[in-house]
Amino acid sequence: MYTSGYANRSSSFSTAVNNTARVATTNTTAGLISEVVYREDQPMMTQLLLLPLLQQLGQQSRWQLWLTPQQKLSREWVQASGLPLSKVMQINQLSPCHTVESMIRALRTGNYSVVIGWLAEELTEEEHAELVNAANEGNAMGFIMRPVSARTHATRQLSGLKIHSNLYH
């Protein structure tokens, strides 16, 4: 049987459209990277913002990874916060360059529902792009926690929360 080239193009076009629609649908549930800037003298504000989300993510079968600079998470705090102790992993005492690299690797695996890392400096555009790609690949969330002192905060912008989301752009 003979089929024209036009018919073949038409079917390949509809396949391409279906594939694009499938990718678009998949991307709406893809990963997210967000930067949370908070005052060091008011850590409770950050907990109020993030704990409900972390509790909800704790219901997934995946881990939560905390990359903390020096402090160690208290078992009592994790349990009192309603987070699943059996799904929370922590790595501490990482240098800032290792924190970003570790976040990228962890997000990419898909083993973590959320990866939280502390950084003193803002991300470069390249680092942010790498984190976004890794979060999308692993269908995970990443939070960059950036503390500022009360003195620094007074001279900076008034907004303390920077949320990157494809839902609003």
Swiss-Prot record:
Q: How does it assemble?
A: Interacts with FtsZ.
Which Pfam families does UniProt cross-reference here? SulA (PF03846)
What the entry lists under SUPFAM superfamilies is as follows: P-loop containing nucleoside triphosphate hydrolases
Task: Give the region (Lon protease binding) as residue ranges.
Answer: 162-169
Q: What does this protein do?
A: Component of the SOS system and an inhibitor of cell division. Accumulation of SulA causes rapid cessation of cell division and the appearance of long, non-septate filaments. In the presence of GTP, binds a polymerization-competent form of FtsZ in a 1:1 ratio, thus inhibiting FtsZ polymerization and therefore preventing it from participating in the assembly of the Z ring. This mechanism prevents the premature segregation of damaged DNA to daughter cells during cell division.
The highest taxon in the source lineage is Bacteria
What family is this? Answer: Belongs to the SulA family.
Asked whether the keyword DNA damage is assigned, the reply is: yes
Induction notes from the record: By DNA damage, as part of the SOS response.
Choose any GO biological process term that the UniProt entry carries and state it: DNA repair
Give the gene name: sulA
Q: Per UniProt, which keywords does this protein have?
A: Cell cycle, Cell division, DNA damage, Septation, SOS response
InterPro entries named in the record:
Cell_div_suppressor_SulA, P-loop_NTPase, SulA_CellDiv_inhibitor, SulA_enterobact
How does it get modified after it is made? Is rapidly cleaved and degraded by the Lon protease once DNA damage is repaired.
Region annotated FtsZ binding sits at: 106-112
User: Which PANTHER family does the UniProt record give?
Assistant: BLR3025 PROTEIN-RELATED, CELL DIVISION INHIBITOR SULA
User: What is this protein identified as?
Assistant: Cell division inhibitor SulA
At which residues is there a site annotated Essential for degradation by Lon protease? 169
Gene3D superfamilies, per this entry?
P-loop containing nucleotide triphosphate hydrolases
